[in-house]
């Protein structure tokens, strides 16, 4: 069976009917090996693998899943990672969610790009506000230091995202721009996003982030957009609380 763009143009998969094995190429692959017990389970590294390698090609993956639905499959053998031979519906269900760009979990990614540490403090404070409002899953990622592949993974995992970034050279601090371009290239869509910008004389981070987000499909950018001048002050907290209310209830 031909499976173009999962994730190479010439990809094909093979179904061995006597043993009911699907040799799935890059489909159902993950980082890791059979003899390694991943404490976070199969999904964590499989999700990171999918969105950073196959993620742009959701439609071809959906087409492959439709072909696979008509086959009797007992074992899946991907090119990368362990052989799958139990609870196949779980793996197939996750691939269906991922390739249709639906959120896997309810939760919030707070991704920040901080130059001197002030935007980082605001992002951490905002995460505390979300937890206080009952949001159980809040992932806080530092775009200057954390693995970009893991930040992209969490962006696709959760249904909401908040971006906090410093203004830089009339735009946004480059690691935030890099992150947004990663999402753009992976067809990020169907999410709710809030924005926190930091600047001194003329903040530009917010409109820059918003402009990139507006090129993506079905992204809801919520208000208010929070503007911090250099460092978070007591007077900034009401706007942050208002945004946290909107995100927590989205």
Question: What residues fall within each predicted segment?
Answer:
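Short, charged N-terminal beta->alpha structural module
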Residues: 111-133
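Cofactor-binding loop segments of dinucleotide-utilizing enzymes, especially the Rossmann-like FAD-
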Residues: 26, 112-115, 143, 197-198
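Catalytic core of the metallo-beta-lactamase
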Residues: 1-38
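Active-site loop segments of alpha/beta catalytic cores
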Residues: 147
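Glycine-rich beta-alpha junction loops
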Residues: 27-29, 80-83, 115
């Amino acid at each position: 069976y031909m499976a173009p763009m999962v994730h190479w143009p010439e990809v094909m998969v093979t179904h061995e009917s006597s043993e009911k094995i699907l040799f799935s190429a890059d489909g159902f692959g993950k980082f890791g090996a059979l003899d390694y017990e991943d404490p976070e389970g199969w999904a964590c590294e499989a999700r990171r693998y999918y969105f950073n390698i196959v993620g742009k090609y959701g439609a071809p993956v959906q087409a492959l899943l439709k072909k696979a639905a008509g086959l009797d499959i007992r074992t899946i053998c991907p090119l990368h990672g362990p052989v799958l031979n139990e609870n196949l519906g779980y793996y197939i269900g996750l691939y269906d969610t991922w390739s249709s760009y639906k959120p896997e979990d309810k939760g919030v990614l707070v991704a920040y790009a901080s130059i001197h540490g002030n935007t980082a403090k605001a992002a951490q404070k905002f995460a505390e506000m979300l937890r206080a409002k009952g949001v159980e899953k809040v992932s806080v990622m530092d775009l200057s230091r954390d693995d970009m592949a893991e930040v992209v993974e969490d962006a696709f995992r959760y249904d909401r995202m908040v971006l906090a970034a410093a203004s830089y050279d009339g735009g946004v601090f480059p690691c935030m721009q890099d992150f947004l371009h990663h999402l753009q290239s992976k067809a990020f869509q169907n999410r709710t996003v809030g924005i926190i910008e930091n600047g001194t004389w003329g903040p530009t981070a917010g409109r820059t982030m918003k402009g990139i987000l507006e090129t993506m499909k079905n992204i809801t950018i919520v208000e208010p957009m929070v503007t911090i001048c250099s460092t978070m002050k007591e007077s900034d907290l009401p706007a942050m609380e208002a945004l946290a209310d909107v995100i927590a209830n989205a």
